[in-house]
Amino acid sequence: MKRTYQPSKLVRKRRHGFRARLATVGGRKVLAARRARGRKRLSA
């Protein structure tokens, strides 16, 4: 069986990137929550 994590910078950016987060209401909530917590990095 192959490993489930096959790293790809492009897919990572598209799925978990800042622009992807801003594109949906849920993603915006994620960013707001991470800002409220004082996270150094908001997204991938």
UniProtKB/Swiss-Prot annotation:
GO MF annotations in UniProt: structural constituent of ribosome
PROSITE patterns: RIBOSOMAL_L34
Family annotation (Gene3D superfamilies): 1.10.287.3980
Keyword Ribosomal protein included in the entry's annotation: yes
GO CC annotations, alphabetized: ribonucleoprotein complex; ribosome
Single biological process term from Gene Ontology: translation
Keywords assigned: Ribonucleoprotein, Ribosomal protein
Xref: InterPro entries: Ribosomal_bL34, Ribosomal_bL34_CS
PANTHER family linked: LARGE RIBOSOMAL SUBUNIT PROTEIN BL34M, MITOCHONDRIAL RIBOSOMAL PROTEIN 34 FAMILY MEMBER
Family per similarity comment: Belongs to the bacterial ribosomal protein bL34 family.
Protein name: Large ribosomal subunit protein bL34
